[in-house]
């Protein structure tokens, strides 16, 4: 593995972790944010179409791409709703943990990914670590009863719904063997359609939507770096490194967006992030 290839493999985490930070920074609320983000992803998809990476000779790629893209938009829209309630630093570790648990359980139960006792043992260890990490990142501040906070409870319910969309986005591609740059254009079309449907009955503005194009472009470019790095460093390594996005988004929420945390919460966040990343590395190497 070349050092440059390793650095490029880190870029998806940087790009994907920055998406929600830019969404919140430019503002506009979750409906402008999802519409703008999905249209931004479509811009990258159109670039692939123009350069000849989108092929129309495989109906499976087209259909799976469209549906999985719409599912991603559903997951992202609900994640943005959670962020509007409890912030980036509270949402992203929980969302990342839920996604890893959801995709892993589906792959194990329905796709038979863990076929050996070693995989089962290490997989269960990783799942326990994920739950522990998520719990640590969600520690309440002193004198705060977070479990009685209606916004926190509502956000957790929204994140469960969000996870369904994200898991569907990932596992559909696995089930039908669809992925890579061939599918990205059709996924981006599905995202744009999904983003429009999800926001059509809500008040949006052209300015706020336009400002949120950038996160979508960044998300699409992060995907391209992922596709480049997988054959260079391996699927397991690229997957594990991409999960470092939770560090970028969580710490960005605290230090860039100014979300306040006390010492106890910061200790829990650092410990939780490290544990979630370790679990992601274990899961990545079980693939």
Swiss-Prot record:
InterPro entries: Sugar_transport (IPR010651). One of its GO terms (molecular function) is carbohydrate transmembrane transporter activity. GO terms for cellular component: plasma membrane. The chain crosses the membrane at residues 7-29, 34-53, 60-77, 114-136, 157-179, 184-201, 208-230, 235-257, 269-286. It comes from the Bacteria. It is found in: Cell membrane. Its main location: membrane. Involved in the uptake of glucose. Belongs to the GRP transporter (TC 2.A.7.5) family. PANTHER family: TRANSMEMBRANE PROTEIN 144. This is Probable glucose uptake protein GlcU. It comes from Staphylococcus aureus (strain Mu50 / ATCC 700699). The lineage of its organism: Bacteria, Bacillati, Bacillota, Bacilli, Bacillales. The gene is glcU.
